């Protein structure tokens, strides 16, 4: 089945192999350039990893979800797709694990791991300690925080001795207030159900729907 869009969820992805991140990014990039490059104090630390044109989605829109738990290889993927304008990054600024470490062998089976270089996105942004900034920021919203907000919220009708609205209908004041309460309760239930599912994914779907409308104009 042909995909018309994709949500790539990299939230809480701590990373993995460098080669794997390059392979993943290359699945969706159809332009010349690089996926990522490294720079260090010694010349042999300076390495570029080129793109291999071949977008398997043929330009279909991509949303990448990230949060503070997205690190290392997942940041390489997100940074490459963002710089090549191949995806919209949504969520939160990533962890910022952009250092290259080399292992030096010592005597008696010991080893020493040294940080020798940093990773940079195609446009030259350092990932280390900065992370990847999202194009669209999303705040973490928990079910408990939403319910607290509901309890704290108030409207005119919630105030003691509030002025009642005039109504030309035959409904009584009690009926009208009951209907208002039911509408509010149903709305709150919808939002709570959304949070139980996945707020980030829901917002990503909304963006993809908007992109589809724009591109079809």
Regions found by a protein language model. Name each.
Residues 1-217:
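C-terminal "post-core" interaction segments
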């Amino acid at each position: 089945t042909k995909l018309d869009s994709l949500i790539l969820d990299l939230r809480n992805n701590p990373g993995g192999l460098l080669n794997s991140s390059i392979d993943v990014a290359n699945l969706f990039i159809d332009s010349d350039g690089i996926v990522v490059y490294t720079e260090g104090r010694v010349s042999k630390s300076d390495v570029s990893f080129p793109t291999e044109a071949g977008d398997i989605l043929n330009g279909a829109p991509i949303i990448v979800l990230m949060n503070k738990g997205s690190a290392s290889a997942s940041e390489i993927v997100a940074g490459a797709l963002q710089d090549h304008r191949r995806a919209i990054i949504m969520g939160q600024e990533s962890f910022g694990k952009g250092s290259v470490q080399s292992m030096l062998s010592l005597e008696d089976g010991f080893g020493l791991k040294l940080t020798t270089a940093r990773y940079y996105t195609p446009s030259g942004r350092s990932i280390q300690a900065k992370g990847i900034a999202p194009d669209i920021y999303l705040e973490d919203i928990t079910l408990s925080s939403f319910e607290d907000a509901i309890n704290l919220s108030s409207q005119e009708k919630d105030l003691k001795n509030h002025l009642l609205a005039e109504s030309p209908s035959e409904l009584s004041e009690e009926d009208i207030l009951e209907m208002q309460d039911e509408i509010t309760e149903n709305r709150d239930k919808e939002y709570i159900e959304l949070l139980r599912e996945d707020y980030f994914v829901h917002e990503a779907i909304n963006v993809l729907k908007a992109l589809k409308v724009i591109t079809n104009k």
